[in-house]
Amino acid sequence: MKVISSIQELRDQLRGQNRAAFVPTMGNLHEGHLSLMRLARQHGDPVVASIFVNRLQFGPNEDFDKYPRTLQDDIEKLQKEGVYVLFAPSERDMYPEPQEYRVEPPHDLGDILEGEFRPGFFKGVCTVVMKLFSCAQPRVAVFGKKDYQQLMIVRRMVQQFALPIDIIPAETIRAEDGLALSSRNRYLSPDERAEAPVLYRTLHDVRDTVLGSDRASADLLAVEANAKESLARRGWKPDYVSIRKRVDLQAPTREEFLAGEPLVILTAAKLGATRLIDNLEI
């Protein structure tokens, strides 16, 4: 596996590779990331990964400086997965001058849910993903469904800019107790780690309530509020538990709900100092 930091060297290395499958990451790789590499191999060849902790998507009170950076360990994991190239640029490599041009998602998708609680987050995500796409020029890119809103935003960005890239969604990888794998799980204390699977169980409770209700009389807002209250009683600080349409992450109208519109439940909540996100399709 070649480890490359220069944009030009990456382009030179991939010249003529018109079926490359790309997996962008911020490093600190776990089994969830490695499953993305395996899925990428099913859809393209060679597999190209990137590791870059993108300052643009971190807010002023977020964990950019303490975000775990484990490059040597990550390299060993990617080598075992048969990744062809790892693009691991420095901040100077990616942004040799101030990044004055940004890619901003539409407000109806970028300023809701995560965007409401992390202003500017998706602008930073879209900007770096667009730049990474420009660097790697892949035919396929794989994004995990754990970051459901990010997946939707990247997919729409690719459509809007007519980029010749297929976006492949990857299922969330979970621990045996249901907790979605995340680099931030390492911040949990032992007691918090024992409590953390409650977030996924709460999503299942919401799904069971929705599926078991009479749709004509169901009150989705009340279901959401009850789920937040349940988490709060256990010591969580929930930002949202929200039932949305899968197609555009907007709240379903009563008519859409009655017609059986495919839905997804999304949540974000703090447990101690650690903010966890998860989702479950209905």
UniProtKB/Swiss-Prot annotation:
One of its GO terms (biological process) is pantothenate biosynthetic process. One of its GO terms (molecular function) is ATP binding. Beta-alanine binds at Q57. Coiled coil: none annotated. Its main location: cytoplasm. Pathway: Cofactor biosynthesis; (R)-pantothenate biosynthesis; (R)-pantothenate from (R)-pantoate and beta-alanine: step 1/1. It catalyses: (R)-pantoate + beta-alanine + ATP = (R)-pantothenate + AMP + diphosphate + H(+). CDD domains: PanC. Homodimer. PANTHER family: CYTIDYLATE KINASE/PANTOATE-BETA-ALANINE LIGASE, PANTOATE--BETA-ALANINE LIGASE. Belongs to the pantothenate synthetase family. This is Pantothenate synthetase. It comes from Cupriavidus necator (strain ATCC 17699 / DSM 428 / KCTC 22496 / NCIMB 10442 / H16 / Stanier 337) (Ralstonia eutropha). The gene is panC.
